[in-house]
Amino acid sequence: MKFTIAFAGLLGVFLTPALADYSISVNDDGNSGGSGQQSVSVNNEHNVANVDNNNGWNSWNALWDYRTGFAVTRLFEKKSCIVHKMKKEAMPSLQALDALVKEKKLQGKGPGGPPPKSLRYSVNPNRVDNLDKFGKSIVAMCKGIPTYMAEEIQGANLISYSEKCISANILWILNISFCGGIAEN
């Protein structure tokens, strides 16, 4: 009996950090044209990362659901959500993001590594009828909010694309632009 209690205690000590949520906050005042604050939370248990950008009316939240392969950005100014498929080649893995958070490499002036990757999406003007196909986390974030699907714009289409875009620059990792659709309003 004593062995079982000791084993359970040790298991809890070692397992808790592996399943814990980690958060950091980053002040964005030093960037050109940027202000406000971003924070990132990693939830290993649910395979989800959440980025909050607090900048007054231009605030937004991004949620990356690694289990379903979808991401969503909730734009407070537009009172809407934009869902898109995660591009695994451009977005850091949950483990890599978790490591950056734990090591606090995202604080200060950035990790000092390569420039952030950029993704550009075209927003479909038609609302998404059923959020369930995107997973519980996205449903919880966007239920009751107009939600739109976005498709990545690739290659030569990027050069000739002239529609208005909304940017969501995520720390010093990824620059995402949502173009057309609700960005035009």
Curated annotation (Swiss-Prot):
Keywords recorded for this protein, A-Z: Disulfide bond, Golgi apparatus, Mitogen, Secreted, Signal
UniProt name for this protein: Gastrokine-1
Tissue: Highly expressed specifically in surface cells of the antrum mucosa from where it is secreted.
Domain BRICHOS: 54-150
Keyword Cytoplasm in annotation: no
Cleaved signal peptide residues: 1-20
Family recorded in the similarity comment: Belongs to the gastrokine family.
The encoding gene: GKN1
Subcellular localization(s) per the UniProt record: Secreted; Cytoplasmic granule; Golgi apparatus
SMART domains for this protein: BRICHOS (SM01039)
TM spans (from-to): none
Disulfide bond annotation, renumbered to this chain: 81-142
Keyword Ribosomal protein in annotation: no
Cellular component terms (Gene Ontology): extracellular region; extracellular space; Golgi apparatus
Function noted in UniProt: Has mitogenic activity and may be involved in maintaining the integrity of the gastric mucosal epithelium.
Superkingdom assignment: Eukaryota
